[in-house]
Amino acid sequence: MLEPRRLAARQIAERMAQILGEPVGKTIGYRVRFESKVSDETRIEVLTEGILTRMLVNDATLEGVSCLIFDEFHERSINSDLALALARQTQEIIRPDLKLIIMSATIDASIICQTLQAPLIESKGRMFPIETIYADHDIDRYQVAQEMAATICQAFRNQEGDILAFLPGQGEIMKCEELLRSVLPSATLYPLYGNLSPEKQRLAIAPSKPGERKIVLATPIAETSLTIEGVRIVVDSGLCRKLVYDARTGLSHLETVRISQDMATQRRGRAGRITSGVCYRLWTQTSEHLMPEQRLPEILDADLSSMVLDIAAFGENKPELLPWLTLPPKGNLVLAQQLLMSLNALTPDHDAHALSGSITAEGSRMAQLPCHPRIAKMMISSDSPASQALACDIAALLEEKDPMGENEDSDMTLRLSILRSARCKKNLGRWNRIAQIAQEYRKMLRIREDNEPIDAEEVGHLIALAYPERIAHATDHTGNFKMSNGNTIFIDPCDSMAANEWLAIASLNLASTSSSNSGQGRKGRVFLSAPVNWKNLPAQTCENISWDSKALAVKMQQETRIGALVIDSKPIQNASRETVSNIICEAARKDGLSMFDWNESVHRLQQRVAQVAEWHPELEIPDLSTEHLLTTARAWLPFYLEEGGKMKTSVTELKKLNLCEILWNILPYDLQQEIDRLAPTHIRVPSGSNIRIDYRLGAEAPVLSVRLQECFGMTSTPTVDAGRQPLLLELLSPGFKPVQLTQDLASFWQGTYFEVRKELKRRYPKHFWPCLLYTSPSPRDRQK
């Protein structure tokens, strides 16, 4: 029988054993992480979901198991979805006799029944009446503890019975507890959250003592499965912490979010288990309709690397082929596989976007450890028992909440030293849970406890094994660092770690933002780190040939790098022609307007060719527009980048390219001839001058700007396009000022010319302005 939480698994096993009048571990047993009570007589085992996954990976036949019960399945944790998918695979291929039962009080059963083709069994159960009291405003997320404390006080004074209050996290619980102690001295306060020891968790859910009124301040750990006797009042903040995976950064972080309606129903139900009760909701009845009906399956926005490793260990190389209830996002699956390949847990795949990769021997060892693959990599890669023992301590510290808090110095070695000192003195206190986890890991690795002094750089080296993309190098002396994945982080200069040149970052939050103008708001915040010697880290030597947008040239360097961090750089003299060409062409695609000399001659050629293409689409003339040329630079530019055995690599050299000649040569010879015939660049006028024709795509007609006097003797409007397109004549004065526009030169000579002649003769009296144009010589002829 699967339960989503350890506390619920223990309590349910204890309750069933109590009904049978037996101790836990006989007929009824349980197995949770690092703890089990089972025997050869055990018939019913209550497990957490990760334990079942491990059982399926180790033995897909599930020998000795006849039925699997998935309890509280509405929570849709990633482990429950994975366990169900693996169990269905086992049922379909190996164990058709294996029975699967899914149980929930609030889930939409019709969808699951349809997907699994399973019958539905419904039980109304027993629920006492519960009065629901809504707030007159939604809770202020920045005043959660204060508003919860006020409502708890109100409920304590106006109602009878014990109180179960739901808060989003441990921080709010501790603050609310502090507020309540001063105003409700007669109440007994019990916190209840995942990081508490099992003993303290049992105290919180135990029945009240005679004459005692209990207030339990809980996270969603108490939302399902648990029955706390005496509770008839629930105070619900309507908030919870959700672990959100950021695929961009590869980091997961907690966000405080609104709960869904089914979660609110589960919480409310805690008040009606024993007798009638009351539920206080710190939101309005109107806003309740805006809450989502069901929570999203965790598999849709979680880090999938542990899941993918388990699937590979199960023997399936293509996770998407499993019979999922909700298919995990392909993008997150690819990211998970890429991470596992970088940790050498999966064999590399040549296609970066393919969903495949077999488990390696190292990956199989990692999959046997009940922790994230990164942590497992660190523990199995340690090269000595002392180093492995240190890795176990680091793993335990990373898995539990930091006993020193996030606002303290980020020195990881300091925490490890405190842990070892407390272990030596047998006075662990708040470090006890961490010490227990480290001990369990040492048992798995079969090594002894080590409390010797710690080498800080060894700590950094181990962290770098788990988080190779979080190796960080100082970019200045004010706490700014750049990580090997390219992201930037900031450490307060007062932090002891800020003085190091190289760090390995164990815990950070790239979502940290600030309204400060210092620029620190764009960087991540570091919680745990250790110094590291970069000389002991694997580095790669590679050629970095790229476009330098500042120098406006191809940068050619041989670099020694750790990810995005450049340790050493030397110039390269001879890079391959193909590589340089590709880089320049890509730069041209992005910023080619500033890289070449797009002068007036180039623009005139483009307009002339485009004009003919518009007149004659049947000619299929290539597109010589600037936009198209830059997009297709790889097709034409490489032929002109080499001269005398040397590549042109800078904008200075590229601007010397004769674009007119290059663009003209893109056209086949027969098209060149046809364009020259249909759209000549110049036309000869009676004066003997060759006047340039101005082609403007989209204009009324090509324009011929010419002095009026040079047209004496021209009886009709000149044309292009084999006589089909008359030119628009822009007739100019001797001072090159426009005096007339016309496409009908013959009509102009017969009419308008005489009016224009009067004005020109007045302004330019020394010039020759004949009356009989057809017989009059041109100005040049007259001078002769």
Predicted segments — roles?
Residues L179, P185-S186, P191, L203, ...:
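Second RecA-like catalytic domain
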Residues G238, R258-Q261, S716, G723-L727:
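Catalytic or ion-translocation cores adjacent to nucleophile or general acid/base/metal-coordination motifs
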Residues H461-M483, E661-P686:
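Short acidic, Pro/Gly- and aromatic-enriched capping/linker segments at domain boundaries
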